[in-house]
């Protein structure tokens, strides 16, 4: 997003006394277990899954925040792509007219996700690149380096 447009959005929000941005933290679960991260609920954690708010709640929250004049929305977690309803929630944000950004560790992005985002582009996808050195990354995440897993798309 160009800085001039961002400044326009922020100024408009300030003038109208509205929250310029919102955040939807969809889940406390993550498919990684990074030692430096505050998220420590496994992707298959039944208790964490049971505590997640239902799709209808998020759709209503999206409606309410848009009606209140909020302009941008960040979708985050844990790892938001773990939610089976992620696309439904994301699409509701786009349909409502939000400028949408996503925080993800990038390990769950699949071809169909890339195609979906190409059709309904987010403003930004923030992918966690904690470490570039393989040994340090494995020590922190106990998984392969995200750069080892990266794929290029046209």
Named regions from a protein language model:
Residues 107-109, 132-135:
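Short gly/pro/ser/thr-enriched loop/turn and capping motifs at secondary-structure boundaries
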Residues 127-129:
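Conserved phosphate-donor/acceptor-positioning beta-strand/loop module used by diverse small-molecule
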Residues 57, 88, 136, 145-148:
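An acidic, carboxylate-rich microenvironment
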Residues 140-154:
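Glycine-rich S-adenosyl-L-methionine
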Residues 43-48, 133-140:
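A short acidic, helix-capping loop that chelates divalent metal ions and anchors anionic groups
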Residues 1-3, 133, 143:
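Short, structured coil/loop segments at alpha-helix boundaries
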Residues 1-124:
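Conserved alpha-helical substructure of the radical SAM core
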């Amino acid at each position: 997003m160009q800085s001039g447009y961002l400044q326009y959005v922020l100024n408009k929000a300030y003038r109208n006394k509205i929250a310029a941005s919102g955040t939807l933290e969809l889940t406390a679960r993550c498919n990684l277990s990074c030692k430096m991260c505050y998220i420590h609920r496994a992707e298959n954690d039944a208790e964490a899954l049971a505590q997640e708010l239902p799709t209808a709640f998020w759709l209503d929250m999206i409606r309410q925040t848009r009606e209140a004049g909020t302009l941008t929305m960040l979708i985050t977690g844990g790892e938001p792509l773990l939610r089976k309803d992620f696309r439904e929630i994301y699409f509701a944000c786009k349909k409502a007219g939000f400028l949408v950004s996503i925080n993800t560790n990038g390990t769950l992005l699949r071809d169909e996700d890339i195609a979906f985002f190409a059709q309904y582009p987010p403003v930004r996808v923030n992918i966690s690149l904690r470490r570039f050195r393989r040994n340090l990354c494995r020590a922190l995440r106990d998984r392969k380096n995200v750069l080892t897993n990266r794929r290029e798309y046209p």
